[in-house]
Amino acid sequence: MYGSLIRIKEIINDLNPSERKIAEYILNNSKAISDLSIKELAGKSGSSKSAVVRLCKILNYKGYKEFRIAIAKDTVNVDKEENRYTDINPKDDLHTIIKNISYNNKKSIDNTMEVLSEELVEKASEAISKAYRVDFYGIGASYIVAMDAFQKFMRINKNVRATPDTHLQVEFASNLKKGDVAVAISYTGETKDTFESIKAAKEAGATTISVTKFGSNSISDLCDINLFVLSPEITFRSGAMSSRIAQLNVIDILFTSVAGRMFEEVKEFLENTRKSTRVKRIK
């Protein structure tokens, strides 16, 4: 499954009835879409041209033409087993597991590149660069991503915080000020504790950034800047693997962008941390 079809699957439950009719028709007839005009798609799905246009915008396409081209590209090899995200299967041998998990992780990064807005990454990088304090909030697998962000930004001497204690998270958030930044990491965008922390940060006046799945959700709807990842949930939800990889990739992008902006200021800190950890190596 490729980017455009995954986008539809991710947001289909949030669509209104007319938009959902179109989405369902596309998922069930993906190979035929490239041959349909906007009027024909509206008619076959029992919807309207205006609903098709709205759906294209929701999916972050400039118009139906761009969307139709994306669908055509995505369906070239859609029937091949190698082009589908896979989950735990007790019948898989080790070779298949290595191949499938590597594919899942790689594809989640490729798909995220399609929905990650350069303009919003720029805004997020600028906000973090200028901020006095930066908080990262996450629970479970998303806390691992928050800690990765903490470790990276600490290396360039940013005043960063991350904690697994949800009480401390919301206390940190409530004491932020205008000019500070809070980053909420939650794949679903519906994690209650993370939502409460980012809500407190926003109410305190901080700039709020989300790293969530593509589309509308409670956390992205609340935040000032949304950095979407695109990695479909698998039935077993085996440890949030590919979605975590996509989130980590977004953090790497943010860190590299911020460090590049501040390079003359932070290169000394990067060198200092490199030297300080050298003594921890065996060789």
Swiss-Prot record:
InterPro entries: Homeodomain-like_sf, HTH_RpiR, RpiR-like, RpiR-like_SIS, SIS_dom, SIS_dom_sf, WH-like_DNA-bd_sf. PROSITE patterns: HTH_RPIR (PS51071), SIS (PS51464). It holds the Pfam family SIS. The keyword Heme does not apply. It comes from the Bacteria. Residues 2-78 form the HTH rpiR-type domain. Keywords: DNA-binding, Transcription, Transcription regulation. The keyword Transcription applies. One of its GO terms (biological process) is carbohydrate derivative metabolic process. One of its GO terms (molecular function) is DNA-binding transcription factor activity. Residues 124-264 form the SIS domain. Residues 38-57 bind DNA. This is Uncharacterized HTH-type transcriptional regulator CA_C0191. It comes from Clostridium acetobutylicum (strain ATCC 824 / DSM 792 / JCM 1419 / IAM 19013 / LMG 5710 / NBRC 13948 / NRRL B-527 / VKM B-1787 / 2291 / W). The lineage of its organism: Bacteria, Bacillati, Bacillota, Clostridia, Eubacteriales.
